[in-house]
A protein has these predicted regions:
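N-terminal cysteine/histidine-rich coordination modules
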Residues: 1-22
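Domain-scale terminal segments
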Residues: 24-141
Length: 141
């Protein structure tokens, strides 16, 4: 499986497809999330990891999103988007969940196994040691 990855910088970390489903607002706060939301890089914005898999651009604005993506895709059987969206506790339908937007060719068991293996390798390269909150973009700039 050919895999390429790079970083871009965006205005808002919430633009990543998994951001809404991973970072849950802490009650009675405006800007606190569990897991923590990423911090912007001064004068650049929020680092977005782009991973190209089988012609599909996967985007992540925080290591927690990448970890969640890997964790979901490694499950056997693959959970449904309805099961995953119900965990958010809101009346949002499963059609808006990132898993429902993932192309079918990437949901096949063998494709998922390969993708999880490679995404773990990418994670080892782009997540700084000692911090699971931010990507290490310095090696790629």
């Amino acid at each position: 499986m050919m895999l390429k990855h790079h970083f871009t910088f965006e205005k808002d970390w919430r633009f990543a497809p998994a951001a809404f489903w991973v970072h849950i607002p802490t009650p009675n706060t405006e800007r606190e999330f569990a897991p923590p939301a990423p911090e912007p890089i001064p004068h650049k914005g929020y680092a977005f990891l782009h991973v190209e898999v089988e012609g599909v651009d996967l985007q992540f604005s925080a290591p927690a999103q990448l970890d969640h993506f890997i964790e979901v895709l490694r499950r056997k059987p693959l959970p449904t988007s309805r099961q995953l969206s119900s965990k958010r506790g809101l009346a949002l339908g499963p059609n808006g969940h990132w898993l429902s937007r993932l192309p079918a060719k990437l949901k096949a068991p063998r494709a998922r196994e390969k993708m999880v293996r490679v995404l773990r390798e990418v994670r080892a390269k782009v997540v700084g040691t000692g911090s699971d909150i931010a990507f290490n973009t310095s090696a790629f700039m």
